[in-house]
């Protein structure tokens, strides 16, 4: 519907109240009279300027503390940091010397750790040099003495390294050469570190106390000035803004009660004056609106009947939608319960597959250990067979030697027999020789008997060796067959493991799919429940619409009565 002239007047006044006014008079007083925003900005600007001057004064008092703090950071604090860094690097240097002694037996390792030692030494010298550059007076002399002491310590360590190398990389010799030489340097560095930290802490405490005093004084001054500015601003705002606004509120309250008889008097040219002009325009606009409402009430009465019929049709459709949605939600809940059962069974199957896979893995490990044991036993059997065969060969050689000895014994026996015959022919002259020949023959017979017994024992040993070799060879063939069977069993276990792994993956996929299906079903069920709830809510709203449409006719009548109460 096009805007009425009264409506356009209200909009123009409201825009004029929001847009800054560009005054034609260039004087500052005219600008302040025509712009409430300028008055507020002047008030706020003056307040902020006063607070800014006070803050600048406080900031100026803090500048000296900031400068002192910067000097602290560049002087004592920096010196304390450098001495801490030098102390840390010196400990690293001592540690690298221990690495040279303990791990430098090989040339490559000794060179590596000695290079690291020299790098740590250079780092300490560099840090002490930087500390000397920032130090002054007695502190600088002490730093130079410490640096010179550290150089002498490096010379002593190099002499100790030379003794270490001359002693064939003996760590005891190297350690004895440098025992206690780092104590003086360590003590000087620790003393200097404690003094620097103490000086830094004292200086920092002094600066902090001064800064706290300055901040406290500045805060008190700033708070007092802020209270004074706030009270002055409150008085000015109450006189120039609050009281005129209260008068406007009273006039608008009369408009809200339907009293359009009086117009507000306008004496100001700023935004509040424009707001008063807009209130008068609003009063004219409302009078026109109430005339239009009287005409619209009649049209509203006729439209309420049509709305009631449409609401009845919507109520029937909503009840049918609610019934169908409830049935689908019940089916989705049943499907979700079924999917949860499938996921649980798939999870149980996956856990069972995991247990079977673990058992198969343990069985495979046992099989592999058995195969290794059989292989080692087969090697031992091969070695035993070789030893037995060597024993058989040695027994054969011994038998040959015994055959030679037996032949010699038989020849000796024949010679002794011939000697006895010759001694008997010689009579008394050969009696002594006959006794000796008889003894020789007796010894030859005993030798032959012993050789026969030894030969019998060797035959027994050879037979036993042959039987043992055959038995071991038979056991070896059986162990090879057993090893092959164990290997086949291991292969089958690996196949079982792979199959169980595949089953486990499939069970997990099934469980995942079932869980996803459950989640989707639950989401659908929730959505259906929400749809059912929305349908129920829509049904209630449609029923309310039906009731509202029935009451709409009565309300239009009441509206007509209310319009009669307005006083133009």
UniProtKB/Swiss-Prot annotation:
Functional description taken from the UniProt entry: Chemotactic-signal transducers respond to changes in the concentration of attractants and repellents in the environment, transduce a signal from the outside to the inside of the cell, and facilitate sensory adaptation through the variation of the level of methylation. Chemoreceptor for inorganic phosphate, which is required for taxis at high concentrations of phosphate. Recognizes inorganic phosphate directly. Can also bind to other components that have a pyrophosphate group, including ATP and ADP.
Membrane topology recorded in Swiss-Prot or TrEMBL: Multi-pass membrane protein
Protein name: Methyl-accepting chemotaxis protein CtpH
Lineage start: Bacteria, Pseudomonadati, Pseudomonadota, Gammaproteobacteria, Pseudomonadales
GO cellular component, one term: plasma membrane
Cellular compartments annotated: Cell inner membrane
Native species: Pseudomonas aeruginosa (strain ATCC 15692 / DSM 22644 / CIP 104116 / JCM 14847 / LMG 12228 / 1C / PRS 101 / PAO1)
Segments on the Cytoplasmic side according to the record's topology features: 1-39, 238-568
Start and end residues of each HAMP domain: 239-291
Protein family: Belongs to the methyl-accepting chemotaxis (MCP) protein family.
UniProt cross-references to InterPro entries, sorted A to Z: Chemotax_Me-accpt_rcpt, HAMP_dom, MCPsignal_dom
Gene Ontology BP annotations: chemotaxis; detection of phosphate ion; signal transduction
Keywords from the UniProt entry: Cell inner membrane, Cell membrane, Chemotaxis, Membrane, Methylation, Transducer, Transmembrane, Transmembrane helix
Induction: Constitutively expressed.
């Amino acid at each position: 519907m096009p805007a009425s002239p009264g409506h356009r007047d209200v909009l123009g006044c409201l825009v004029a109240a929001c847009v800054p006014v560009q005054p034609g008079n260039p004087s500052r007083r005219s600008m302040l009279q025509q712009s409430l925003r300028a008055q507020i900005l002047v008030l706020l600007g003056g307040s902020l300027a006063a607070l800014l001057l006070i803050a600048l004064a406080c900031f100026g008092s803090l500048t000296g503390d900031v400068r002192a703090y910067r000097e602290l950071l560049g002087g004592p604090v920096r010196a304390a940091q450098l001495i801490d860094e030098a102390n840390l690097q010196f400990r690293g240097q001592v540690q690298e010397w221990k690495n040279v002694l303990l791990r430098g037996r090989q040339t490559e390792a000794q060179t590596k750790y000695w290079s690291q030692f020299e790098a740590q030494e250079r780092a300490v010298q560099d840090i002490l040099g930087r500390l000397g550059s920032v130090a002054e007076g007695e502190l600088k002399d002490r730093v130079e003495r410490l640096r010179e002491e550290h150089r002498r310590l490096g010379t002593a360590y190099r002499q100790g390294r030379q003794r270490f190398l001359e002693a064939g990389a003996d760590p005891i010799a190297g350690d004895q050469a440098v025992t206690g030489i780092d104590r003086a340097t360590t003590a000087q560095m620790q003393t200097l570190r404690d003094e620097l930290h103490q000086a830094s802490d004292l200086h920092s405490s002094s600066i902090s106390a001064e800064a706290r005093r300055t901040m406290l004084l500045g805060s008190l001054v700033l708070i007092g000035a802020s209270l004074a500015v706030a009270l002055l601003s409150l008085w000015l705002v109450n006189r120039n803004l609050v009281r005129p606004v209260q008068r406007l509120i009273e006039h608008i309250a009369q408009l809200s009660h339907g009293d359009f008889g009086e117009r507000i008097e306008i004496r100001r040219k700023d935004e509040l004056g424009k707001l008063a002009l807009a209130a008068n325009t609003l009063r004219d606009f409302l009078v026109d609106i109430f005339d239009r409402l009287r005409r619209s009430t009649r049209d509203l009465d006729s439209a309420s009947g049509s709305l009631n019929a449409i609401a009845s049709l919507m109520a029937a459709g909503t009840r049918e939608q609610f019934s169908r949605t409830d049935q689908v939600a019940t089916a989705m809940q049943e499907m979700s319960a079924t999917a949860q059962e499938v996921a649980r069974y798939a999870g149980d199957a996956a856990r069972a597959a995991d247990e079977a896979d673990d058992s198969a893995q343990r069985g495979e490990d046992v099989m592999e250990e058995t195969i290794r044991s059989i292989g080692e036993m087969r090697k031992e059997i091969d070695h035993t067979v070789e030893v037995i065969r060597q024993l058989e060969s040695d027994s054969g050689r011994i038998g040959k030697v015994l055959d030679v000895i037996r032949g010699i014994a038989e020849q000796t026996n024949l010679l002794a027999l011939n000697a006895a015959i010759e001694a008997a022919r010689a009579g008394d002259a050969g009696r002594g020789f006959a006794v000796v020949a008889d003894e020789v023959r007796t010894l030859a017979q005993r030798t032959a008997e012993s050789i026969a017994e030894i030969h019998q024992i060797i035959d027994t040993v050879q037979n036993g060796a042959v039987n043992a070799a055959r038995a071991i060879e038979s056991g070896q063939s059986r162990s090879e067959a057993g090893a092959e069977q164990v290997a086949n069993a291991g292969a089958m276990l690996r196949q079982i493991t792979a199959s169980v792994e595949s089953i486990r993956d499939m069970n997990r996929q099934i469980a995942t799919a079932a869980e996803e299906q459950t989640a989707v079903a639950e989401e659908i069920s929730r959505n259906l429940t929400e749809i059912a709830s929305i349908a129920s809510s829509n049904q209630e709203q449609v029923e309310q619409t039906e009731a509202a449409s029935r009451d709409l006719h009565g309300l239009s009548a009441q509206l007509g009565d209310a319009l009669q109460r307005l006083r133009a």
